[in-house]
A protein has these predicted regions:
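Short alpha-helix boundary/capping elements
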Residues: 35-38, 65, 69
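Conserved short "hinge" loops at termini or chain/domain junctions
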Residues: 1-56, 87-97
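Short, hydrophobic/amphipathic alpha-helical patches that form generic packing surfaces
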Residues: 55-67
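Protruding loop/beta-arch "assembly-hinge" segments enriched in small, turn-prone residues
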Residues: 67-97
């Protein structure tokens, strides 16, 4: 999955028309921030991203977008769950060689 595909899914998730480009710069920045946050969690991302990785990046970017409107909002449990599962899965694969 490419960053352009992630942007398309993010726009759909946020109910932003695909033809609207006025927020693309902001959304692309949020995608980049999400990539950094996910890797800081210890998750290794492939190139190109798998569907699971792309979805995780999109979910994180959507969370950051929504948090801008409500700074008191907490991370959705589904996002935290996905982060934890991906990290544990990768660590288990490393241990099992």
């Amino acid at each position: 999955m490419t960053k352009a595909e992630i942007l398309t899914i993010l726009k759909s998730d946020l109910e932003i028309a695909q033809t609207t480009t006025s927020k693309d710069s902001l959304l692309n920045n949020l995608i980049e921030l999400s990539l950094g946050a996910v890797t800081r969690e210890g998750i290794t991302l492939s190139d190109p991203y798998t569907i699971e990785e792309g979805t995780l990046i999109e979910m994180y970017a959507a969370y950051l977008y929504r948090r801008r409107r409500d700074p008191e909002s907490t991370m959705p449990h589904s996002l935290r769950y996905m982060l934890n599962n991906m990290l544990l899965s990768q660590k288990a694969r490393l241990l099992n060689g």
